[in-house]
Each structure stands twice: as structure tokens, then as C-alpha cells.
């Protein structure tokens, strides 16, 4: 678990990778500085943070109010802001990762976003991923949803319902993940 585990690793490191983890640390700038301090000269820090919300469904499902995923995104954004604010040692930070990496004494090398595009009809594996993701959203945000959106989400998750993500022919996975790299010079 970060940041304590950093002391248990062998240093200096030629490569450190942090995937979707820094946003769970109260002081992201301090965490990046700790990573930078453990890199060998010429070593690279790669972080996966940012990107775009994933999409799985058409805007209009044929039941419920159109735009469910946009409303779920808004709930997720509110949850994320609360989660960040409640972290021990939380420091508000503009999530400009190249600038944060430079501020940690690293030279920003590159940012690249990777697109995951699994068009409809989705494979069983993709459907399982979609169902798992929506089930997590239902568990975390179920009480915040209005009755219609909760019923829509429940129907999408009901494997016995032909309109669920387990059976719909229009389920897809579209996601973008950003990776930022920086190098320790000197």
C-alpha cells in the first residue's frame, strides 16, 4: 500500500509504475516527489491517471430515462471529490499530471492516451466486465439514484432480463486511459 510500501522496494529503480493509484493518496505532489527520489538517474516514472469515463450502452436504452450513463458519471464525479477531500493529508491539486511530474523534479517525457474499443455485440468477457462495473456503481451509488434510474440499473443487471447487459445486442466497451511518463535526469 502506498506510500508505505515504497520503503520496502529496492532502489534506485529504473522504472516505477503507478496505475490509477495516486488519486487515492492525500498529497499527490508529495507522492510523486517520493517516487522521483527513488528513481535512478535516467529512470522513468509512468503513471496512469486521467482519461475519460467509460461507455457501455446507447444513450436511449428503450426503457428508463435516456442518458443514464451521463447521470452515473455525475454521481461518480461527486463521489470522487468527496473521497479526495476525506483522504488523510488531502491537498487540493489541479490534476495537470505533466506539471505535477515536473514539480517533482522530473522531466516530462510524454503523455499518451490509449483507447479501448470493443464494439457491439460484446463478448461474454466484455459483458462480465460491464456487469461488474455497473454492479459496483449500483452498490456505491444506489441510494443516491432516483427510483427510475435505480430500477433501470437493476434491470440492466438482472441476468434473467433480456434487456440486461448480459443479453443486449448493443452492449459495447469504449474507454480512454492516459499514461504520463517522466524521467529523472542527473
Where are these predicted regions, by residue range?
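A short His-aromatic
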Residues: 23-25
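A short beta-strand submotif of the Rossmann-like class I SAM-dependent methyltransferase core
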Residues: 18-21
Amino acid at each position: 500500500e502506498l506510500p508505505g510500501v515504497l520503503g520496502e522496494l529496492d532502489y534506485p529503480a529504473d522504472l516505477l509504475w503507478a496505475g490509477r493509484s495516486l488519486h487515492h493518496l492525500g498529497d499527490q505532489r508529495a507522492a510523486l516527489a517520493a517516487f522521483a527520489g527513488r528513481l535512478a538517474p535516467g529512470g522513468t516514472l509512468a503513471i496512469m491517471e486521467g482519461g475519460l469515463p467509460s461507455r457501455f450502452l446507447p444513450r436511449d436504452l428503450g426503457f428508463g430515462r435516456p442518458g443514464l450513463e451521463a447521470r452515473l458519471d455525475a454521481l461518480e464525479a461527486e463521489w470522487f471529490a468527496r473521497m479526495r477531500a476525506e483522504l488523510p493529508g488531502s491537498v487540493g491539486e489541479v490534476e495537470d499530471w505533466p506539471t505535477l511530474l515536473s514539480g517533482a523534479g522530473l522531466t516530462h517525457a510524454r503523455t499518451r492516451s490509449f483507447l479501448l474499443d470493443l464494439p457491439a455485440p460484446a463478448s461474454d468477457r466484455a459483458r462480465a466486465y460491464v456487469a461488474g462495473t455497473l454492479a459496483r456503481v449500483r452498490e456505491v451509488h444506489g441510494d443516491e439514484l432516483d427510483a427510475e434510474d435505480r430500477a433501470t440499473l437493476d434491470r440492466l443487471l438482472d441476468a434473467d432480463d433480456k434487456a440486461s447487459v448480459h443479453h443486449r445486442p448493443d452492449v459495447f466497451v469504449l474507454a480512454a486511459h492516459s499514461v504520463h511518463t517522466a524521467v529523472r535526469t542527473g
